[in-house]
Structures are given as structure tokens and as C-alpha cells.
């Protein structure tokens, strides 16, 4: 196992942080495509439309072209929301990480470094409108480069956020993650997070059958 350490973000980390985050999010494009491909409505479309073309035109070539086009369209649909999400993040909080996190009271951004290179990231910001009587911290942007997974880095980064929250007297740490990110969900549940709810971020995600899961870690004294 290659050694690593966790430290606070520095401006010189920005390019590598963006790279880790972007690649981490775009890895979910293939799994989104596979999930959508196996939906009954998708299978019905892939079989029904080409078959209708064969019955109307008598051309199997046209049917094959239609299937290819539908698969290409499905791939583009699976790709677009992740690309838009990354673009939105890079134009908002991640355009200036120091301003968005390090200069905000009760917030922070950490990186995991190994061999002089950033291999993992995580961020946290206070929840703007928490429930009455609660002081909540939201965990964001957890991602570890594919070459450094399986070494406990994601768990260590999450522990860093939990310790920060404890030190800052937060009552809860909350986060949201896609149901597709089963590895992340398993990690959080194994660390004591509890499911607090779920919802669909948009009509697209509802049609795709992929919900956003809300998780919460409450400190015993809270």
C-alpha cells in the first residue's frame, strides 16, 4: 500500500483537484448508460421501434440503423447530466476553492496526497438553513483517483470531515449521493451514516429511475 497523508487544500493543487473530481464524476457515465439500457421502457423502445420499421418498410437494414441510432441517443442522454453537473461545479464553488471553502467560517477543503500528487479530495460547508436547533455540515466532492482506490483513502477523507465537524461543534454531517454510487453509499452506511430520505433531482433522473439518496451522521451528544 502506497503511503498517503491528508492536508488542507492549497491553490497549487487546483489543476489536479479538478482532474480528480472530473474523472471521478465521468466514471458514472457508463454505469448510467447500462442502468438505462436495462429499464423495461428502454428495452421496449429498442425492440418495438425497429420491429415497427421492419413491418412498415420490410427493411432489416433500416431496423439495424434505427437500433444503432437509439443506442447512440441513449449514450448521449446518459452522458449529458454528468457533464452538466461537472461544468456547473467548475463554474461555481470549484472555480475558486480557497474563496468557496477556506475563507468561509466553518468550511474546509482537504486533499489526500501520495507521492507528491493529489489522489483524493473532499470538502465541507455549513448547511445554510438547517432544521431548528441543529448545526449541520454538508460533505461535498468526495472523490479518489481510480489508481488509488482500495487503500482506505475515501474512508480517511470522510473521517477527516467527521472530526472537523466534531471539533466545530456541529450536530450532524449530511450529504447527498446518487443511487448509482453504490460504493459510496456502502462506505457511508458502514461509517455510521443513516439514510434520511431520497428524491429525484430532475425529470430526467426520474425517467431514468436513478434517485438521489440523502444521508446523515448525527453525533451522540447532539
From Swiss-Prot:
Keyword hit for Iron-sulfur: no
Coiled-coil portions: none
UniProt main location, coarse: membrane
Keyword Manganese: no
Localization of this protein: Membrane
EC main group: transferase
Alphabetical list of InterPro entries matching this protein: Acyl_CoA_acyltransferase, GNAT_dom, NAT_camello-type
Membrane-related topology note: Single-pass membrane protein
Pfam family, one: Acetyltransf_1
EC number assigned by the record: 2.3.1.-
Example of a GO MF term: N-acetyltransferase activity
GO-annotated biological processes: gastrulation with mouth forming second; negative regulation of cell adhesion
Domain N-acetyltransferase residues, every copy: 69-220
Cellular component, GO, one term: Golgi apparatus
Ranges annotated as spanning the membrane: 53-73
Entry superkingdom: Eukaryota
Entry keyword set: Acyltransferase, Developmental protein, Gastrulation, Membrane, Transferase, Transmembrane, Transmembrane helix
Family listed: Belongs to the camello family.
Cited function: May play a role in regulation of gastrulation.
Protein name in UniProt: N-acetyltransferase 8F1
Species: Mus musculus (Mouse)
